[in-house]
Curated annotation (Swiss-Prot):
Taxonomic placement: Eukaryota, Amoebozoa, Evosea, Eumycetozoa, Dictyostelia
Domain of life, per lineage: Eukaryota
Keyword terms, alphabetized: Developmental protein, Repeat, Signal
Positions of B- repeats: 65-82, 127-144, 161-178, 195-212, 229-246, 263-278
GO biological process: actin filament polymerization; cell adhesion; cell migration; cell-cell adhesion; cell-substrate adhesion; chemotaxis to folate; macropinocytosis; pattern specification process
C- repeat placement: 145-159, 179-193, 213-228, 247-262
One GO cellular component term noted in the UniProt record for this chain: vesicle
Intervals holding A- repeats: 25-64, 88-126
Protein name: Prestalk D11 protein
Region forming the signal peptide: 1-25
Amino acid sequence: MLNKLILLLILSSCLVLSVKSEVNVDCSLVRCAQPICKPHYRLNMTDSCCGRCEPCTDVACTLQVKYCQDGEVPTGCCPCTLPPTKPDCSLVKCARPVCKPYYRLNMTDSCCGRCEPCTGVACTLQIKYCKDGEVPTGCCPCTPQPTKKPDCSKVPCPKILKYCQEGELPTGCCPCTPQPTKKPDCSRVPCPKILKYCKEGELPTGCCPCTPQPTKKPDCSDVMCTMDIRYCKNGELPTGCCPCTPQETKVPDCSKAMCTMDIKYCKPGEKPFGCCPCRENLTQ
């Protein structure tokens, strides 16, 4: 029994000595290379002479990008960011692209550059015409100068009146006609009922406008026309191979007209129209 007690005392003393030897390690006699921890890991030197990497916990890093300075390595709990590598453009030969309007040239990570849309750029609304040799490129491009007037000596223009549409300017060899600013009061203006074609240079404007000349006579060699009188419809012109007959007068309102039963012969120049028409004198 005594021998067993002595053996237990010896074993307990050995354990105490071994624990003390592990806690109090003499690192002066230890040679090792400290490990390089990857980003978001840190070196722990608490219970090791050479240290070991462990994850960073309870560490707050800013969201702002911090680029590494000269010689700095992206390690630690809040590592820096390596700056973008610039290519060696000394041995590169290329033609820089010409960017279209509202695009700009970016030379950040390319030797020849690339075009990218302009963002965050404010341009004035005032028109800036391009100078001699200037090209309309860049974020706020210039406006090309209007071209010279063309040679209109050999350009045939139609004689039909063409009014300018919205936004159209009376320019070019065959310019449009500006819209009349104000229509005249034609309620008391009597107009002749005879068809009047426009003369050269005359425009069908005013209270009694002329009728534009037909642009081209049609080929009526194979057209058969009847002998029946066909009056022109509303807006129809007496043109074409089988022209209509112009309406002499509008149909009057004869609901209140009082006509006699006596025969009334037409006077010279009078035609049998109206509510009480005359009768043509066939004996003359």
